[in-house]
């Protein structure tokens, strides 16, 4: 059994960042039937999902607690690939801070080809 862990105190002004990120994440959501835009927004509001925003990109993550370890899951991303790649060290530090031992991510074949050299 796995569960998402609420770790964010969500004190930053997420709504302003969400206005920018929403169209990028909406595009990514076209490839899943597990979530819709309202689900993602609610997850951010409740601190279950974490919103990462760059100048041209956005990413949504969540921390999942499995029986034997914690992992950070890269749920959705959109925008500039190089900028998203540059976010990974910060996400790794964040994950380590919360005791995560793994980083997971999935996606379309195009993303998977790009992420494979990074160890995904």
Please give the residue ranges for each predicted region.
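Short amphipathic alpha-helix that is part of the acyltransferase structural core
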Residues: 1-35
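Short glycine-aromatic motifs
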Residues: 12, 49, 117-120
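Active-site rim helix/loop that mediates acceptor-substrate recognition in acyltransferases
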Residues: 29-49
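Short, flexible, glycine/charge-rich loop motifs used to bind or transfer phosphoryl groups or to couple energy/partner
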Residues: 40-42, 63-64, 93
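Conserved donor-binding loop and adjoining core beta-sheet/short helix segment
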Residues: 45-82
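Acyl-donor binding region in acyl/amide transferases
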Residues: 69-118
């Amino acid at each position: 059994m796995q569960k998402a862990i609420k770790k964010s105190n969500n004190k930053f002004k997420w709504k302003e960042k969400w206005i920018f990120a929403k169209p990028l994440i909406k595009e990514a959501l076209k490839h899943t039937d597990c979530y819709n835009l309202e689900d993602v927004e609610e997850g951010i509001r409740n601190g279950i999902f974490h919103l990462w925003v760059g100048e041209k990109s956005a990413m949504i993550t969540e921390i999942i607690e499995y029986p034997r370890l914690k992992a950070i899951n890269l749920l959705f991303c959109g925008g500039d690939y190089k900028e998203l790649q540059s976010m990974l060290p910060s996400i790794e530090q964040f994950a380590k801070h919360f005791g995560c031992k793994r980083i997971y991510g999935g996606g379309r074949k195009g993303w998977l080809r790009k992420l494979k050299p990074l160890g995904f």
